[in-house]
Amino acid sequence: MGLCKCPKRKVTNLFCYEHRVNVCEFCLVDNHPNCVVQSYLTWLTDQDYDPNCSLCKTTLAEGDTIRLNCLHLLHWKCFDEWAANFPATTAPAGYRCPCCSQEVFPPINEVSPLIEKLREQLKQSNWARAALGLPTLPELNRPVPSPAPPQLKNAPVMHKEVPVHNNRSSTPATHLEMEDTASYSVSNNDVTFARKKNYGAESSSDTRPLLQLRDADNEENKYKRRPTMDWMRGLWRAKHGGSGVPQERASAKKIALFVIFLAVLALITIIMVMKRAGYSGEHSSDPLFDPMANPNIRVAVEDSRLPHV
């Protein structure tokens, strides 16, 4: 950091390599337009500098110069020709300094004397005006040299007679049938594309609403507990599509399989509940089912001492 010697007495970190003084941006624009200027810390690291243009390798004092936002100095003519070789579709961020690869166009919200002068210089070329969003000017277009036609010296002229055949065979007519027909219409303001496809009985334009009335989520239903059927319906929609699909498109086989699955699941649940309740059929250890323990039941007991008839 240093203090500029101009009447403004501004504290600055810019340093002029040629005059070896600290300069502010106002002095840089007015009094040091063709001097090599970098930060003071850069000068402390390396005091050597190149007074030539990085593009044409000639002295910077020989022509008009442009100082980029990174403080690198180049000939305006060399820089204009270098940037004009970029494609017309190059984005503003694609233009970068050939020395340090920093963006050429400064941010829109950044304001300083150096940036204001840089923007004024860039407006003198159509490639920069297009990148800045300004209309291009015809007088700023670069002249395109027309290629000179090749000159033929002492070239012999050969005349060759081509026989004319009157008995040419007629070309058979060819009929092309295309299923898809595409047509487009272009205007000055917008571009409209129309395409028609043949899908049998189905029409290409579907005017069904994306959301049905039952899909609406009211405020009063937002925090209401959902019934079980809504939960089942949500699973069905997640598996086989939303409610916007017509019923005739649903597969009857899938519906039947889903109903059978629910019936089997309910049957298994009932069997497990009854088994837990004690109706499994194993009553050998239960005294209530022992006929010998019931006093109302008389069972004849065979005596081995009685004679058999």
Curated annotation (Swiss-Prot):
Residue ranges, annotated region (Disordered): 200-221
Cellular component GO terms, alphabetical: Golgi apparatus; membrane
Keyword Transmembrane helix belongs to the record: yes
Highest taxon in the source lineage: Eukaryota
GO molecular function, one term: zinc ion binding
Zn finger region (RING-type): 53-101
UniProt keyword Magnesium, yes or no: no
Zinc-finger ranges (B box-type): 1-43
Residue stretches spanning the membrane: 254-274
Membrane association type: Single-pass membrane protein
Record keywords: Membrane, Metal-binding, Transmembrane, Transmembrane helix, Zinc, Zinc-finger
InterPro entries from the UniProt entry: ZFPL1 (IPR039043), Znf_RING (IPR001841), Znf_RING/FYVE/PHD (IPR013083)
Compartments, record wording: Membrane
Family: Belongs to the ZFPL1 family.
Protein name (Swiss-Prot/TrEMBL): Zinc finger protein-like 1 homolog
Organism: Caenorhabditis elegans
